[in-house]
Amino acid sequence: MRNLPIIALDFKSADEVHTFLNKFNEPLCVKIGMELFYQTGPALIKSIKKRGHDIFLDLKLHDIPNTVSKAMEGLARLDVDLVNVHAAGGIKMMEEAKKGLRKHNADIKIIAVTQLTSTTETQLHEEQNIQTSIEEAVLNYARLTKKAGLDGVVCSPLEAEMISKELGTDFLKVTPGIRPKGAARNDQQRITTPEEAKTLGSTHIVVGRPITQSEHPIDSYHKIKESWLS
């Protein structure tokens, strides 16, 4: 996966995606989530790959180990660049996910979601019944992910630094919750700017609405890209 800001393609149709991508004349890294994938299926992935873009397929698989393994066998054939599972599924599920992926593709990176960046500490305690801080809950899931042999985690940039210190800088930290200065928070709770994310140890950042809903998406993307790579 190129070290570029990953644009979250939060659109409802393939036509909207291609209209957006047609504005750009350069290789991009993009994220396809559940909403878009369930609407468009593998056909959109193939068309985006033909354009030369890298793809993070963000489906957050979470099921029994055998089911996730078989699902990963199918996703491996799509030739995306990055896939993910939920760390809450446990070590065995994550190990089987990687095995399923490797049956057909040795190059796709696989990471695990720790806690969503929309999760608050109150929700963690009262709804998930995890009686630790968010930071400790995230770090615990990151430890399990590395033990399972995966390539990294999805986490808030606010947690990237502590994960790097314990699990190493080569362990991927893919961080949503990125907002340029002055941008709306939307439904994100644990956020930083691109510059802060880099300082904290994020290896990749995911940015959606500040680019896709911008009146000038190319300019917005290039400003974020410049601040991330500088």
Swiss-Prot record:
GO-annotated biological processes: 'de novo' pyrimidine nucleobase biosynthetic process; 'de novo' UMP biosynthetic process
Catalyzed reaction equations: orotidine 5'-phosphate + H(+) = UMP + CO2
Lineage: superkingdom: Bacteria
Pathway: Pyrimidine metabolism; UMP biosynthesis via de novo pathway; UMP from orotate: step 2/2
Catalytic site: 60
Protein EC: 4.1.1.23
GO molecular function, one term: orotidine-5'-phosphate decarboxylase activity
Residues that coordinate or bind substrate: 10, 31, 58-67, 117, 179, 188, 208-209
Key words, A-Z: Decarboxylase, Lyase, Pyrimidine biosynthesis
GO CC annotations, alphabetized: cytosol
Cysteine pairs bridged by disulfides in the record: none
Alphabetical list of InterPro entries matching this protein: Aldolase_TIM (IPR013785), OMPdecase (IPR014732), OMPdecase_AS (IPR018089), OMPdecase_bac (IPR047596), OMPdeCOase_dom (IPR001754), RibuloseP-bd_barrel (IPR011060)
Stored Gene3D superfamilies: Aldolase class I
Tagged with keyword Lyase: yes
Presence of the UniProt keyword Cell membrane in the record: no
Function: Catalyzes the decarboxylation of orotidine 5'-monophosphate (OMP) to uridine 5'-monophosphate (UMP).
Family that this chain belongs to: Belongs to the OMP decarboxylase family. Type 1 subfamily.
PANTHER family with a match to the protein in the record: OROTIDINE 5'-PHOSPHATE DECARBOXYLASE
Subunit composition and interactions: Homodimer.
Protein name per Swiss-Prot or TrEMBL: Orotidine 5'-phosphate decarboxylase
Organism: Staphylococcus epidermidis (strain ATCC 12228 / FDA PCI 1200)
Lineage: Bacteria, Bacillati, Bacillota, Bacilli, Bacillales
